[in-house]
């Protein structure tokens, strides 16, 4: 999982999700979560049950699935054909297009579009939490 993009990206404040919100995805029992987050936000998950793989993971292909915001992680996992869930803003980068839940670029990507405004992240995360047990069944 990765919850934040490059802090220098012009749209980072919109496309990244605060760890405190994103961490609600890890409340599912019986599932191990691993952080693919790099940079200054990698330490956000310290003290949680999420295992940080920063500097340890040599191959994203070794993951079962990836949940991420719109970052390079999404594109790498998508290009590798990994099942990838990308949480995108209501007005995302052009690559994700509008009104789609899939990606024309990556066949294994599912898009979770934010409801309008930052207040929409909790609703988006709720949709992911509802779908996650189905994905793992």
What are these regions (language model features)?
Residues 1-137:
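Catalytic machinery of carbohydrate-active enzymes
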């Amino acid at each position: 999982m990765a919850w934040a993009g490059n802090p220098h990206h012009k749209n980072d404040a919109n496309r990244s999700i605060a760890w405190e919100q994103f961490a609600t995805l890890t409340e599912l029992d019986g599932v191990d979560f691993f952080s693919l987050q790099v940079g200054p936000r990698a330490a956000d998950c310290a003290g949680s049950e999420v295992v940080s793989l920063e500097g340890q993971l040599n191959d994203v292909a070794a993951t079962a699935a990836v949940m991420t915001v719109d970052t390079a992680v999404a594109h790498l996992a998508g290009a590798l054909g990994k099942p990838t869930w990308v949480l995108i803003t209501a007005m995302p980068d052009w690559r994700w297009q509008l009104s789609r839940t899939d990606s024309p670029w990556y066949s294994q990507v599912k898009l979770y579009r934010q409801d309008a405004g930052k207040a929409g992240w909790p609703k988006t995360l709720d949709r992911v939490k509802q779908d996650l047990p189905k994905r793992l069944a």
